[in-house]
């Protein structure tokens, strides 16, 4: 019976995800402050090419032209996130140097916020040729940069995916408001930050507040009474969709629709680590997030309440019969999940921007990570997030940047056709 119910829930989830995907992928990225397009023009011999002209514009009327410096580098400030048209003036390239892919002279680029780096490959002669820049022609530096960016993005997604998977494993609830827990965590930190607390102090306080108020409190006020009334999983899932809408537009009502940044670390100069460029805050956040994920995994595997969580996830009725307080376990899981989500929201806000629909923008990716890794599995959520994060970045090598999320979701579909239970999920037999 339980398997049949979960199968029905899964079917509804896939249908809702399809509709949600159309909405998210069709929406334009929100505008942010301190958004910059950076890149470089490097000759085949490795030397920088100066005085190359590049123009960036959007449909709102923004247009800015920049030129590369003596090292071939350029940085063009943007008004915020969005889709931009990039035009490279090939007449400013030196004689004997051309774009390997002529289509790079005019292309569109989706920028979510922060610092966006583009890499343009140059060759000797007229360029182009019969093979104009497919995946096999990508430079090693470009591949490593995208791989690195994908890992960092995957770590951030894992914070949301792990909490979502813990809640699903213990309650069977497919929580469509989980992405908005990221938003609430980020805006809690933003309130404290704007009240005068440094973000280093505001962030951990916000995580604790979010864990207690939006995790434990939400379960106490909403989900526990619904479980006591034997509300069905599909009905609870629909309630979570309504809750997500209420949270999302509530944040928009009280904070406005414009993006907002924290008072510290909104813009940082990039650093070079070999062929990879990043920012100090991105490295620190990724390191702290990795530590948080490791601690959570150890807690689930080794602690008494963690073992009880696994028992409830396997069979709630049997766990209750052996003396485990199922409701206490669920309350703890909700608290941990909300804390991880709040951390993910602060991570997202520091690296991109804080805006009312920031959680919705990554919700589909979080669901994809959970489904790909395996529903109800701790390691699966993390591995799924890393796989999705890396594929989202790497697929931009072969498809337009604004469609890179589609490529990652296509890979997820292919993997699920081969292994329906996900990478680490367990196969269940019906009947």
Which sequence ranges carry the predicted segments?
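Helix-loop-helix "hairpin" substructures at the membrane interface of multi-pass membrane proteins
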Residues: 277-354, 383
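Alpha-helical transmembrane segments within multi-pass membrane transporters and channels
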Residues: 198-243, 383-384, 388, 419-420
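Short, acidic Ser/Thr/Gly-rich low-complexity loop/linker segments typical of extracellular
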Residues: 61-73, 77
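Structural motif
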Residues: 38-50
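Transmembrane helix-bundle core of multi-pass membrane transporters
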Residues: 234-302, 329-332, 406, 430-431
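Cytosolic-side transmembrane-helix boundaries in multi-pass membrane proteins
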Residues: 82, 231, 325-328, 400-431
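Single transmembrane alpha-helix segments in multi-pass membrane proteins
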Residues: 143-190, 221-231, 235, 372-378
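Inter-helical junctions in multi-pass inner-membrane proteins, predominant
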Residues: 142-146, 300, 333-370, 395, ...
């Amino acid at each position: 019976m339980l398997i049949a119910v979960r199968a029905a829930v899964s079917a509804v989830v896939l249908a809702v995800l399809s509709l949600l995907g159309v909405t998210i992928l069709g929406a334009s990225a929100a505008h942010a402050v301190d958004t910059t397009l950076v890149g470089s023009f490097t000759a085949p011999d490795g030397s920088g090419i100066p005085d190359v002209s590049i123009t960036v514009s959007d449909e709102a009327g923004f247009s800015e032209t920049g030129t590369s410096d003596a090292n071939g580098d350029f940085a063009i400030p943007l008004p915020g996130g969005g889709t931009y048209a990039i035009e490279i003036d090939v007449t400013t390239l030196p004689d004997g140097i051309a774009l390997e892919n002529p289509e790079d002279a005019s292309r569109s680029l989706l920028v979510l916020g922060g610092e966006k780096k583009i890499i343009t490959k140059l060759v000797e002669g007229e360029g182009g040729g019969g093979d104009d820049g497919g995946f096999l022609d990508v430079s090693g530096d470009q591949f490593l940069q995208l791989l690195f960016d994908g890992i960092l993005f995957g770590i951030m997604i894992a914070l949301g995916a792990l909490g979502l998977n813990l809640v699903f494993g213990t309650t069977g609830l497919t929580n469509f408001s989980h992405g908005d827990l990221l938003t609430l965590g980020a805006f809690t930190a933003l309130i404290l930050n704007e009240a005068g607390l440094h973000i280093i102090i505001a962030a951990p306080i916000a995580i604790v507040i979010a864990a207690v108020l939006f995790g434990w409190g939400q379960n106490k006020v909403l989900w526990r009474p619904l479980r006591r009334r034997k509300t069905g999983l599909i009905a609870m899932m629909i309630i979570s969709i309504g809750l997500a809408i209420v949270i999302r537009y509530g944040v928009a009502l009280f904070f406005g629709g414009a993006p907002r940044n924290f008072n510290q670390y909104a813009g940082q100069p990039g650093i070079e680590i070999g062929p990879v460029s990043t920012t100090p805050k991105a490295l620190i956040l990724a390191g702290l997030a990795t530590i948080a994920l490791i601690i959570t995994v150890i807690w689930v595997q080794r602690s008494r309440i963690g073992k009880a969580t696994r028992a409830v996830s396997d069979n709630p009725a049997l766990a209750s019969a052996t003396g485990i307080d199922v409701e206490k376990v669920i309350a703890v899981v909700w608290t941990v999940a909300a804390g991880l989500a709040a951390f993910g929201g602060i991570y997202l806000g520091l690296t991109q921007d804080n805006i009312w629909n920031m959680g919705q923008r990554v919700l589909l990716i979080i669901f994809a990570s959970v489904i790909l890794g395996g529903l109800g599995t701790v390691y699966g959520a993390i591995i799924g997030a890393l796989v999705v994060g890396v594929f989202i970045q790497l697929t931009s090598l072969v498809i337009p940047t604004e469609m890179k999320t589609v490529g990652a979701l296509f890979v997820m579909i292919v993997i699920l056709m081969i292994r329906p239970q996900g990478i680490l999920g367990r196969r269940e037999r019906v009947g």
